[in-house]
From Swiss-Prot:
The name this protein goes by in its record: Calcium uniporter regulatory subunit MCUb, mitochondrial
InterPro entries per record: MCU_C (IPR006769), MCU_fam (IPR039055)
Primary role: Negative regulator of the mitochondrial calcium uniporter (MCU), a channel that mediates calcium uptake into the mitochondrial matrix. MCUB is required to limit mitochondrial calcium overload during stress. Acts as a dominant-negative regulator that displaces MCU from the functional uniplex complex and thereby decreases the association of calcium sensors MICU1 and MICU2, preventing channel gating. Mitochondrial calcium homeostasis plays key roles in mitochondrial metabolism.
Family: Belongs to the MCU (TC 1.A.77) family.
Subcellular location: Mitochondrion inner membrane
Membrane topology: Multi-pass membrane protein
Principal cellular location given in the protein's record: mitochondrion
Gene name for this UniProt entry: MCUB
Length: 336
C-alpha cells in the first residue's frame, strides 16, 4: 500500500516487518531567493556602459569607407547624426565648413583648429587636415576629432601619385583651355566695361579742369611775352631817347645777369632745366591740382582706375592672342 507523505508527488514503500523504525521527518525545502537588480545612471543610455560599439551622441567620428573618409557628427538644430563624404584631394576646409552650414542653417559659426589651438586656413586641403587630430568648433562649442592613422606611402607610390596629378591637370587644361580662355575674355570685357563706366564721370570733370588749367597757363605765357616786350621797349626808349648807349650798356648787363640768377634759382628749387616746355608743364600741373581740390576731384582714384583699365586691356590682348594661336594650331592639325 502506498502512503502520501509531505510531497504528494513522491511515493514510499511500507517498511517490512521487523525493520520498522520511527519515521524521520523529511528536511524542509530552502526558502525561495529573489535576485534584485538596480540600474544606475541614465536609463536611456544604459547600454553604453556595457557595449563599446555604441557611440556617444555628440562625438564626431572619422572612418574610411571605399577609400573615402566619412565624417559623422550630430547636427545642432535637428539633433540628428549626419554623415559627410569628403573628397580629400578636391575638398578644402572652407568647402567642408560651407557644407555643414548648408546642411544645418542653425550653424552660425564654424571653424577648425589644430590640436594645440592654431586656426587652420580655409584653403587647406582635407587630405592634409585628416593626417592629424583636430578640433571642430561649431557655434562656439569645441569637439575633439581623432583621425584614424593611415599608412605612410612609399616613395614610389608618392612619385606615382604626383605623376598622376600632373597628368590629370594637363589633361584638364587641354580639354578646358578654350572654354577657360573664353570665360576669361568675357570676364575681362565685363571688367573693362565696368571700369569705363566708373571713369566716364571722372573724365568729364577732368576735361573741364584741364581746359581751365590750359587757359590759365596760356594766359600766363602771354603775360610773360607782354612783360618781355615792355622791358625791351623801355630799354630802347631809355637808350635812344633818354640816355645814351654808354650809360645803358651796364644797365642791360646787370639785367641779363639778374635773369641768369633767376634761371639758376629755378634749377635749384625744381631740379629741372629752365625750358619753356618744362615751365609750361609745371605751371599747368599746379593749376590742375589747385582746381581739382576746389572741385573735389580724386586724382589718385582716377590714376588707379586708369592703371586697372590699361592692365585689363593688356590681359585681354594676351588672351585673344593665345586663343588665336590655339585656333591656328588646330587648323594646322586638321590640315595635316
Amino acid at each position: 500500500m502506498l502512503q502520501r507523505g509531505l510531497w504528494p508527488w513522491r511515493t514510499r514503500l511500507l517498511p517490512t516487518p521487523g525493520t520498522w523504525r520511527p519515521a524521520r521527518p523529511w528536511p524542509l525545502p530552502p526558502p525561495p531567493q529573489v535576485l534584485r537588480v538596480k540600474l544606475c545612471g541614465n536609463v536611456k543610455y544604459y547600454q553604453s556602459h556595457h557595449y563599446s560599439t555604441v557611440v556617444p551622441p555628440d562625438e564626431i567620428t572619422v572612418i574610411y569607407r571605399h577609400g573615402l573618409p566619412l565624417v559623422t557628427l550630430t547636427l545642432p538644430s535637428r539633433k540628428e547624426r549626419c554623415q559627410f563624404v569628403v573628397k580629400p584631394m578636391l575638398s578644402t576646409v572652407g568647402s567642408f565648413l560651407q557644407d555643414l552650414q548648408n546642411e544645418d542653417k542653425g550653424i552660425k559659426t564654424a571653424a577648425i583648429f589644430t590640436a594645440d589651438g592654431n586656426m587652420i586656413s580655409a584653403s587647406t586641403l582635407m587630405d592634409i587636415l585628416l593626417m592629424n587630430d583636430f578640433k571642430l568648433v561649431i557655434n562656439k562649442i569645441a569637439y575633439d576629432v581623432q583621425c584614424p592613422k593611415r599608412e605612410k606611402p612609399s616613395n614610389e607610390h608618392t612619385a606615382e601619385m604626383e605623376h598622376m596629378k600632373s597628368l590629370v591637370h594637363r589633361l584638364f587644361t587641354i580639354l578646358h583651355l578654350e572654354e577657360s580662355q573664353k570665360k576669361r575674355e568675357h570676364h575681362l570685357l565685363e571688367k573693362i566695361d565696368h571700369l569705363k563706366e566708373q571713369l566716364q564721370p571722372l573724365e568729364q570733370v577732368k576735361a573741364g579742369i584741364e581746359a581751365h588749367s590750359e587757359a590759365k597757363t596760356s594766359g600766363l605765357l602771354w603775360a610773360g611775352l607782354a612783360l618781355l616786350s615792355i622791358q625791351g621797349g623801355a630799354l630802347a626808349w631809355l637808350t635812344w631817347w633818354v640816355y645814351s648807349w654808354d650809360i645803358m650798356e651796364p644797365v642791360t648787363y646787370f639785367i641779363t645777369f639778374a635773369n641768369s640768377m633767376v634761371f639758376f634759382a629755378y634749377f635749384i628749387v625744381t631740379r629741372q632745366d629752365y625750358t619753356y616746355s618744362a615751365v609750361k608743364s609745371r605751371q599747368f600741373l599746379q593749376f590742375f591740382h589747385k582746381k581739382s581740390k576746389q572741385q573735389h576731384f580724386d586724382v589718385q582714384q582716377y590714376n588707379k582706375l586708369k592703371e586697372d583699365l590699361a592692365k585689363a586691356k593688356e590681359s585681354l590682348k594676351q588672351a585673344r592672342h593665345s586663343l588665336c594661336l590655339q585656333m591656328q594650331v588646330e587648323e594646322l592639325n586638321e590640315k595635316n
